[in-house]
Amino acid sequence: MRIGINGSSLISTGASLAQIVDHAAVADAEGFSSYWLAQLAVPDALTAIALMGARTSRIELGTAVVPTWARHPLMLAAQALTTQEAIGNRLVLGIGLAHKVSVEGTLKIPFATPAKHMDEYLSVLMPALVDRAVSFAGDIWSGEMAGLTSPAAAPGVMVAAMGPRMLRLAGERTDGTILWLSGPRAIAQQIKPALDQAAAAAGRPTPRIVASVPVCVTKKPDDVKGMVAALLAGYNDLPSYRGVMDAEGVGGPADVSLIGSEAEVLAGLQSFAEAGTTDFSALEFIVDPDDAAPTRALLREAATAG
């Protein structure tokens, strides 16, 4: 299992674009396999990743994830290919549906037929990226374009998927899934079997599974878990997340996080690996500044051990 860094928490703490790029550069220098950034409000994740290209040399850079409702797939393809060229073909384009509350509350777009939405979105996006041409007419998304020229290789595409229909789409048509707050039991018993079956039926390689949860090496686990529970309480009310947490047998986000001693966090990482996770994207959740160094040291050792 490869170990990467999820830098998305920097956005919610008000980090500048320069600080986020610096964070990715350090992850590259320290030997982590990948660096992931969510598309929230600002900054634009793909633009930030394009800037990371000049400060990094080998690390894989990915979006985790770009919500699809606000961007036409042809426009996203153009932006992804531009970013891919800028960073030397190291991009993974992670996309996802987001949630009814954010799509309807912020974008004022009806969150209707989400699985069909993603199916049609991929029907435009994938040929645009791979074939550089698309001709598709759907009920939600359509595209007609030829001659998309770019020297960049097609980036890998992954879909945030936890339920059966989305896992089938991810397995059949993309490189895998990107997960948040999904634990080892849910991955082993629910996510990986459905994803692998769909990929095999479509004649595709075994898919990647990128899992991300809060991580902290600390002597005060109850304090950190309490903060995780408070800050991430909203996920308890989102059906897709509630479903995977129920499958995990946990009460909430704090229970699936890796928070505790070095031995406890290492055991948690091993559980993710044994469940079939191919990539673990650690979101370093630091409450006490004294926990930052031991958390990063453990993750760095795990990342470079193999």
List each model region and its residues.
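Active-site-adjacent structural elements that line small-molecule/cofactor binding pockets in enzymes
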Residues: 1-306
